[in-house]
UniProtKB/Swiss-Prot annotation:
GO terms for molecular function: arginine-tRNA ligase activity; ATP binding. This is Arginine--tRNA ligase. It is found in: Cytoplasm. NCBIfam families: argS (TIGR00456). Its EC number is 6.1.1.19. Its main location: cytoplasm. It comes from Coxiella burnetii (strain Dugway 5J108-111). GO terms for biological process: arginyl-tRNA aminoacylation. GO terms for cellular component: cytoplasm. Monomer.
Length: 592
């Protein structure tokens, strides 16, 4: 059995043997250690694989790259799978492999089925992934959708490469925004009893807040009702709602807690949290994004993790007191300024929670820890790496991946989003409009750090310009061929087809075979680089090659040997498209 990555390894072995021969002959010094890089050529006229080894070793050898390339080629051992080796340009070495090497990829694919392309590259390595982790203060919007699709795809790719992946969502259930959420629900609840009271302008304004308030009213009646006068009496007169709206909002939250008391406040708070978090969970599950754990921030306090982090930073000399607060000496570890850990009122900051949460991740013994953040969190990178050093943890284990938010266009008009303002397009609305498949694919078809203009009309179109439709249509077309086969007197003899793969000699077939052989390498590269867009682009290429082949050749022909060989080939294409789409969280329909 062969795949492209296996062929690369074989060529690398041949080159290493050639280098050892050149060392024996004195052409290269014994201490020379080559770094061999083998790439797939883009032009078949230049062979199937190429290496720049002669260019990288020319200085150590003391000769021109082309002359060294000649020496390397002369020293190469013979191989039954390589038909020709040529030198191109200043010293590139091109390898041409036998057609039989590519034809055997069909049998490899059909034998492995849904497992083709999977590897044990990451066997024994555990990876912790955190992604989305949007505050449970409202429904997910289209910006969150990109992080969800990207994170889920990266997790799938790492799993396919043999890594054991733990998927986690961090639930911010203990921050200031949650207090504002509880306040927003409570004010809407009071308005439901016709209280003459206005929702503070910086509170959460969406219709979903009213829905939660109505459910609260239906279940608890007037249990949480207080007069407008009693509320206003709790708001300090010196706070101007226009001059300092955030301070005014905080005063409201304090008033709510005082009036309701701990038990009733917790009841309102929990009703809001449960409603929104359940909605987020359902939304993501419908989107095909699932988690192994939903980790609440409140657990950090409950299990003493914040104190554990604080103690460790203190032990290492990175904590000091100023103005009644406890500070992290972040500037000593590369950050632009020191950070408050514990406020003077004794409450931990968001930063302290970040420290505790990452300490918890590292304490679990993962080999890799991946945080996927929105691009607006780029400033977090130096501070996170800084406190990891302060904790005595290895920052190189942490990989922070930034995802640009998707920008949604309806026609030529850009849609703005604001969670507190309530005017935003939700992920659910997007999914219902364009479908899960289009949303999942469009979100990951560009590099995550590139801006994504999400074209609604293109995502809904059934045309060749819509990449996900084009790929799915290739799969459906192949299914159609096999349905047509059942209506004829012809049969499909898979073993006979395997015996006649050498008949696949057209340029279309050679191109498809070469592309099929690249699939395992694409999965490995996409996994190691956290780059699902590489798989998306590969599937577009494969689909395009198949459509060209479909339009040029016939499959249900009279020639039994060629028919069976071609049916095996397109069955392999069908399997790879299905495997690839599955990793991207996209369906492979049999009819369209």
């Amino acid at each position: 059995m062969i795949d492209l990555s296996t062929m690369k390894q074989q060529i690398e072995t041949l080159l290493n043997q050639a280098i050892e021969r050149l060392k024996t002959k004195g052409v290269l010094k014994p201490e020379v250690t080559p770094v061999i890089k083998i790439t797939h050529t883009t032009d078949p006229q230049h062979g199937d694989f190429a290496t720049n080894l002669a260019l990288t070793l020319s200085k150590a050898a003391g000769m021109r790259p082309h002359a060294l390339a000649e020496k390397i080629v002369e020293a190469l051992p013979p191989s039954g799978q390589i038909t020709e080796v040529e030198i191109a340009g200043p010293g590139f070495i091109n390898f041409f492999v036998t057609e039989g090497s590519y034809q055997t990829v069909v049998s490899s694919i059909l034998k492995a089925g849904k497992d083709y392309g999977r590897s044990e590259m990451g066997k024994g390595q555990r990876v912790h992934m955190e992604y989305v982790s949007a505050n449970p203060t409202g429904p997910l919007h289209v910006g969150h959708g990109r992080g969800a699709a990207y994170g889920a795809c990266v997790a799938n790719l790492l799993n396919a490469a043999g890594f054991e992946v733990h998927r986690e969502y961090y639930v911010n259930d203990a921050g200031r925004q949650m207090g504002i959420l509880a306040l927003s629900v409570w004010v809407r609840y009071l308005q439901g009893y016709e209280a003459s009271i206005e929702l503070p302008k910086n509170a959460y304004q969406g219709e979903y807040i009213i829905d939660i308030a109505e459910a609260l009213k239906a279940k608890y009646g007037k249990q949480f009702y207080h007069s407008v006068e009693s509320i206003q009496a709790k708001i300090p007169e010196e706070i101007d709602s226009n001059a300092d709206p955030e301070a005014y909002l905080d005063a409201w939250v304090t008033a709510q807690k005082d009036l309701l008391g701990p038990k009733d406040f917790e009841c309102v708070f929990q009703a809001a949290l449960d409603s929104i978090l359940n909605d987020i969970k359902n939304d993501l599950e419908e989107f095909g994004v699932t988690y192994d754990d939903w980790f609440p921030e409140s657990r950090l306090v409950r299990e003493g993790l914040i104190q554990e982090g604080l103690d460790l930073l203190t032990k290492h000399g990175y904590v000091y007191e100023k103005n009644g607060a406890q500070w992290f000496r972040a500037t000593a570890l590369g950050d632009e300024k020191d950070r408050v850990l514990i406020r003077k009122n004794g409450l931990p900051t968001y930063f302290a929670a970040d420290v505790a949460y990452h300490l918890h991740k590292f304490n679990q013994g993962y080999d890799q820890i991946i945080d996927i953040f929105g691009a607006d969190h780029h400033g977090y990178i130096p501070r996170i790496r800084g406190f990891l050093k302060g904790l005595g943890k290895a920052p190189e284990k942490l990989h922070i991946l930034l995802v640009q938010f998707a920008i949604l266009y309806r026609g030529n008009e850009k849609v703005s989003m604001s969670t507190r303002g309530g005017t935003f397009v939700t992920l659910r609305e997007l999914r219902h409009e364009v479908g899960n498949d289009a949303a999942r694919f469009f979100y990951i078809m560009r590099k995550p750090d590139q801006h994504l203009d999400f074209d609604l009309e293109l995502a809904k179109s059934q045309s060749n310009e819509n990449p996900v439709y084009y790929i799915q249509y290739a799969h459906a077309r192949i299914c159609s061929v096999f349905r047509q086969l059942k209506t004829t007197q012809k049969n499909w003899d898979r073993p006979r087809g395997m015996e006649n793969l050498s008949l696949l000699s057209t340029n279309y077939e050679k191109e498809l075979l070469a592309t099929l052989g690249r699939y395992p390498e694409v999965i490995k590269r996409a996994a190691m680089n956290y780059a699902p867009h590489l798989l998306a682009h590969y599937l577009q290429t494969l689909a395009n090659q198949f459509h060209t082949y479909y339009n040029a050749e016939r499959f249900l022909i009279e020639d039994d040997n060629l028919r069976n060989a071609r049916l095996n080939l397109i069955n392999a294409v069908q399997q790879i498209i299905r495997n690839g789409l599955t990793l991207l969280g996209v369906s492979a329909p049999e009819e369209m």
